[in-house]
Amino acid sequence: MKDIQKERDFRNMPIDKVGIKNLKYPIRVLDRKNGCQQTVGTINMYVDLPHESKGTHMSRFVEMLHILQPEISPKTFSVILDQMKKDLDAASAHMEVTFPYFIEKAAPVSGTPGFMEYTCKLMGTSRADGRVDLVSEVVVPISSVCPCSKEISDGGAHNQRGEVRLAIRSKKFVWIEDLIQLVEAAASCELYSVLKRVDEKWVTEKGYQNPKFVEDIVRDVAVALKNDTNITWFNISVENFESIHNHSAYATITCGRINP
């Protein structure tokens, strides 16, 4: 059977990335408490394509993923990227895996358990010279109370949910749980999936006693990361979904060196 993709292309235009996008696939990720967690990844897989090649082999991406049945971690990412380059005869390979990650959290006073969902992402690139660049990302929902509102009001203060997006490069493996805890510690208060009345009282009072602007939250996360010698680069963005405005408050910090 004729294979059109193996024919030569004469437009003299190499392609930076070509492959598959938004593939939903079952994956396993490392779980600090339970060892492993089954979840569903949304996966993008790309390779480069030289100017003389007409097309890549799209089916091989999924075949490879199914054969490997991967546990998704920084260590296995490098293996998958190398396999992509080998199977698709490519100089470089790139993969992104986004997945929901669940942590069981007890309510702060009653101890009632419930699962919190966090969106996580691993991104990796294997370059032509063999160097591998890996980025880990978590999105952590938080609560914040406005310091200005508390200061000027006779009673109460406006508060809202927010979202902290944290991406890092590191020398060694970092647990997802550690990144989440670092972010939650910088918020006015962390979120819980289940709150009884005694818990709701505790959460409300903790947030009120710990008011923070987006500027405070992003700086507190940045300081904690700068004090960790394992972290070589980070990007933090904080967005508060303002309860008294029809817009969000936003702040971001990037720090560190990206290897060329």
Swiss-Prot record:
Keywords attached to this entry: Hydrolase
One Pfam family per UniProt: GCHY-1
Catalysed conversion reaction: GTP + H2O = 7,8-dihydroneopterin 3'-triphosphate + formate + H(+)
A GO BP entry: tetrahydrofolate biosynthetic process
One MF term in the entry's GO annotations: GTP cyclohydrolase I activity
Positions bearing the site annotation: May be catalytically important: C146
Pathway(s) where this gene product acts: Cofactor biosynthesis; 7,8-dihydroneopterin triphosphate biosynthesis; 7,8-dihydroneopterin triphosphate from GTP: step 1/1
Enzyme Commission number(s) from the entry: 3.5.4.16
UniProt enzyme class: hydrolase
Keyword Cell wall biogenesis/degradation annotated: no
Purpose of the protein: Converts GTP to 7,8-dihydroneopterin triphosphate.
Record-stated family: Belongs to the GTP cyclohydrolase IV family.
Protein known as: GTP cyclohydrolase FolE2
Source organism: Desulfosudis oleivorans (strain DSM 6200 / JCM 39069 / Hxd3) (Desulfococcus oleovorans)
Name of the coding gene: folE2
